[in-house]
Curated annotation (Swiss-Prot):
It comes from the Archaea. GO terms for biological process: methanogenesis; methylation. It is a multi-pass membrane protein. GO terms for molecular function: tetrahydromethanopterin S-methyltransferase activity. Coiled coil: none annotated. This is Alternative tetrahydromethanopterin S-methyltransferase 28 kDa subunit. It is an enzyme of class 7 (translocase). Keywords: Cell membrane, Membrane, Methanogenesis, Methyltransferase, Transferase, Translocase, Transmembrane. It catalyses: 5-methyl-5,6,7,8-tetrahydromethanopterin + coenzyme M + 2 Na(+)(in) = 5,6,7,8-tetrahydromethanopterin + methyl-coenzyme M + 2 Na(+)(out). Composed of six different subunits. It is found in: Cell membrane.
Length: 12
């Protein structure tokens, strides 16, 4: 979730 896998926007 660090701009690698845009599935769960935790740190957007």
């Amino acid at each position: 979730a660090e701009k690698l896998e845009p599935v769960l926007p935790l740190i957007v």
